[in-house]
A protein has these predicted regions:
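Asp-based phosphoryl-transfer active-site loop
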Residues: 1-17, 45, 200
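Short glycine-/acidic-enriched loop or helix-start segments at secondary-structure transitions
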Residues: 8-9, 54-57, 82-83, 199, ...
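Basic, amphipathic juxtamembrane/active-site segments
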Residues: 9-35, 208-212
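Short, flexible loop segments at the rims of nucleotide/cofactor-binding pockets, characterized by
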Residues: 20-24, 48-49, 165-168, 184
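Active-site phosphate-binding/coordination module
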Residues: 26-114
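Short, aromatic/basic amphipathic alpha-helical patches
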Residues: 58-60, 135-141, 213-222
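Conserved acidic, metal-coordinating active-site core of Asp-based
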Residues: 104-202
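Mg2+-dependent phosphoryl-transfer enzymes with acidic/Ser/Thr/Gly-rich catalytic loops
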Residues: 166, 173-248
Length: 248
């Protein structure tokens, strides 16, 4: 499961997850479902957030009795649990790449700031979605300059106002393989973003929310997966209850 669990719509008695610009909420019905499921399934959270960005959610879940078997953070660049992380590409020199980009930054680029909480990839945050959309291809062009740049083999993608620079072979599916081995393919999982397609296409039972990205919906339907009839807190609650019924 990924950040699909969290939504920005406030709800009574929710677990509040502070964010950089706004809070997210994990509904009580979602919490209750996760408690029950974690008693009979290995629950893994896979997210594009850093550990700093997920810590409040993970610790809140644990306080409420949810057992978490493992984490994939930074879009799969780092897996495990705090104190025992595995970095998928430990040879990367992200500080060197960051310094090189800063030194060669084009003044026509949209303004952005580096997110300091990411350790195993680079993440730049723009002020608006539109500026992030403009920034992403410029980052890609710069990162693809293998002859001049300090790091080869990178991919660039946008998630909201964040633009990621990460190893081209690193993603949530690769991270789940490191964490779970062959068991990853027999998993059930829910995601609603384009960075979830890489693993939703490989697992046994994918699921997503109403209103997700069209490519995600296509992948889940093609696999005979679960599509909630709603979005938001109600949608993820529906997915969890469907999974509970199927695993009794």
């Amino acid at each position: 499961m990924d950040g699909t669990l969290l939504h920005t719509e406030p709800v009574a008695h929710a677990l509040v997850i502070p964010g950089r610009t706004r809070s997210s909420y994990l509904a009580p019905t979602v919490m209750e479902g996760l408690v029950r499921l974690s008693q009979r399934l290995d629950l893994v959270l896979a997210t594009g957030r850093s550990w700093d960005g997920m810590q409040a959610a993970v610790e809140g879940l644990q306080r409420h009795g949810v057992t978490i078997a493992g984490l994939c953070v930074e879009d799969g660049a780092k897996v495990g649990m705090p104190g025992s992380w595995t970095v998928l590409e430990p040879h990367r020199q992200w500080h060197r790449l960051r310094s090189w980009i800063d030194a060669s930054r084009d003044p026509t680029w949209p303004p952005f700031a580096w997110q300091e909480d990411f350790q195993s990839c680079l993440v730049a945050r723009a002020d608006t979605y539109a500026e992030a959309e403009r920034l992403a291809p410029r980052f890609f062009a710069r990162a693809a300059d293998d002859d001049d740049g300090p790091e080869a083999g990178l991919r660039v993608f946008r998630d909201g106002r964040k633009v990621f620079l990460i190893g081209e072979a690193v993603n949530k599916w690769q991270a789940l393989g490191v964490l779970l081995g062959e068991r990853a393919a027999s998993g059930v999982g829910f995601g609603d973003g384009l960075n979830d397609v890489c693993w939703l296409t490989h697992i046994e039972r994918p699921g997503t929310l109403h209103g997700c990205a069209p490519e995600v919906l296509r992948v889940v339907r093609a696999a005979g997966g679960i599509v909630a009839s709603q979005g938001g807190h109600a949608g993820i609650t529906e997915l969890l209850r469907t999974l509970e019924a199927e695993t009794r």
